[in-house]
């Protein structure tokens, strides 16, 4: 039992968000680190892509557009992917807002994370040198009666075709190659992702 408390503390500490304190002539003001970076127009998408993640990212994109519709927004991605519908909410908002949305992969951009990475403004898609990118087709787990499984299968096939066409548009690859290359998990280095058209630059230092 004596070792349980340190482990609990470590688990809680991993969820802590650092606080930044800024001092000016008007006194001190504190921000959580993500709010402070939001002031610099940096949005983080970290972890699974789900409805909660999508709501937060979409809200931040819309807020930053209202603040300045002419200044770029940076979306930093470290995600294994997740829900297609949640990812498409982010994707559509990225295309909808007036500012260019620059994307940067740090760590991993897989599945829907890779799709959103490739969906950034042309010429403004980046990855760090040791980042990994993975593309594949949508996953499905159809259950229920035969008619229900048929409906779900049609929807998955539609989503696969839609995602393939969008990925072809953003990478410059033809749809047939995208379909072949996403048939199974397809991992790439940053340089491979650049050659494929998923990103435009491999960043080793901030410009």
From Swiss-Prot:
Q: How does it assemble?
A: Fourteen ClpP subunits assemble into 2 heptameric rings which stack back to back to give a disk-like structure with a central cavity, resembling the structure of eukaryotic proteasomes.
Upper classification of the source organism reads: Bacteria, Pseudomonadati, Pseudomonadota, Betaproteobacteria, Burkholderiales
Q: Which gene encodes it?
A: clpP
Where found, per UniProt?
A: Cytoplasm
Keyword entries, A-Z: Cytoplasm, Hydrolase, Protease, Serine protease
The EC number(s) this enzyme carries: 3.4.21.92
Pfam families in the cross-refs: CLP_protease (PF00574)
Q: Provide the primary localization.
A: cytoplasm
Please report the name of this protein according to its UniProt entry.
ATP-dependent Clp protease proteolytic subunit
Q: Which family does it belong to?
A: Belongs to the peptidase S14 family.
- The lineage's top-level taxon is Bacteria
Which Gene3D superfamilies does the record match to this protein?
2-enoyl-CoA Hydratase, Chain A, domain 1 (3.90.226.10)
């Amino acid at each position: 039992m004596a070792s349980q408390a340190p482990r609990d503390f470590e688990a809680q500490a991993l969820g802590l968000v650092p606080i930044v304190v800024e001092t000016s002539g008007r006194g001190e003001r504190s921000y959580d680190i993500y709010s402070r970076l939001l002031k610099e127009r940096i949005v983080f998408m970290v972890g699974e892509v789900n409805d909660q993640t999508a709501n937060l990212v979409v809200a931040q994109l819309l807020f930053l557009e209202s603040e300045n519709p002419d200044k770029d927004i940076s979306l930093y991605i470290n995600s294994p992917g997740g829900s297609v519908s949640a990812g498409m909410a982010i994707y559509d908002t990225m295309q909808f807002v007036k500012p260019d949305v620059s994307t940067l992969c740090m760590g991993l951009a897989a599945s829907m994370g890779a799709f959103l990475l490739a969906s950034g403004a042309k010429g403004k898609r980046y990855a760090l040198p040791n980042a990994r990118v993975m593309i594949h087709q949508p996953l499905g787990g159809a259950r229920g009666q035969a008619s229900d499984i048929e409906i779900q299968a049609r929807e998955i096939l539609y989503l696969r075709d839609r995602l393939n066409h969008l990925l072809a548009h953003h990478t410059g690859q033809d749809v047939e190659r995208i379909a072949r290359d996403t048939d199974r998990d397809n991992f790439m280095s940053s340089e491979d992702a650049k050659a494929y058209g998923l990103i435009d630059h491999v960043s080793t230092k901030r410009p």
